[in-house]
Amino acid sequence: MKLTLRVWRQKNADADGAMSTYEVDNISSDMSFLEMLDTLNEELIIKGEEPVAFDHDCREGICGACSLVINGDAHGPERTTTCQLHMRSFNDGDTIDVEPWRAAAFPVIKDLVVDRSAFDRIIQSGGYISAPTGAAPEAHATPVPKPDADFSFEHAECIGCGACVAACPNGSAMLFTSAKVNHLNVLPQGAPERETRVLDMVAQMDSEGFGGCTLTGECATACPKGIPLPSIAAMNKEWLRATRKARG
């Protein structure tokens, strides 16, 4: 395959960025999108040019590091992570636009790499269990109803890639935050801190500069792990419950 790439290049958060055009050839349809970018960078290095900076780690759809807007879609045309997107999803001769996540809370570090530490701070504010749970109990000593277990597992699949924020016209992080709240709050171990957890995490999310949620649903559509839109409603219910309890 021969492709034309229009790639966002930006030295740092304070510099102005622009799209740069590159031609790449001999791209196999079996390559992942990141392998295609590797090929581009190899050619740029041979020419003595600066390679394109982009984020990646596991390349197995687990870590959530890869974060590209491809032809206007977070992670590209398929509902998967960028590292699991293959070039067979494109046609020979295509022009492909490659940009970083676009959100005020995700400033550009360089080229296609953005700073997503705002997500880390949301988790640090309450996305954990610190209440003493004692020694490891016998496996069946703390029963968890299957619907609760399924609900928790479904939300624990969130990898924090940020596609929900990139896809949202408001740059909202509600889907991410709701996934992190919901996967702990329904478990017995997470119940003692459920009120403080949701209040603290929502407050931290708001302080990071993410936009407000208007339930457009773009977040759930873009999520490569299928976190459902009703997750947001579940968190809102938790937040209202905790707020009323805090007010007495």
Task: Identify the residue ranges that each predicted region occupies.
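Eukaryote-biased recognition of intrinsically disordered, low-complexity regulatory segments
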Residues: 1-23
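Structural beta-strand/beta-sheet cores of well-ordered domains, especially the beta-sheet scaffolds
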Residues: 3, 20, 64, 94-96, ...
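Acidic/polar N-terminal loop/beta-strand segments that form early-domain functional surfaces
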Residues: 8-10, 25-27, 57-59, 71
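Short, contiguous acidic and Ser/Thr-rich linear segments
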Residues: 20-32
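Ferredoxin-type iron-sulfur electron-transfer modules in oxidoreductases and energy-metabolism complexes
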Residues: 31-50, 96-248
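A basic, amphipathic helix-loop patch mediating RNA/tRNA/ribosome contacts
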Residues: 39-73
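A generic, well-ordered mixed alpha/beta core segment in the N-terminal half of proteins
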Residues: 63-118
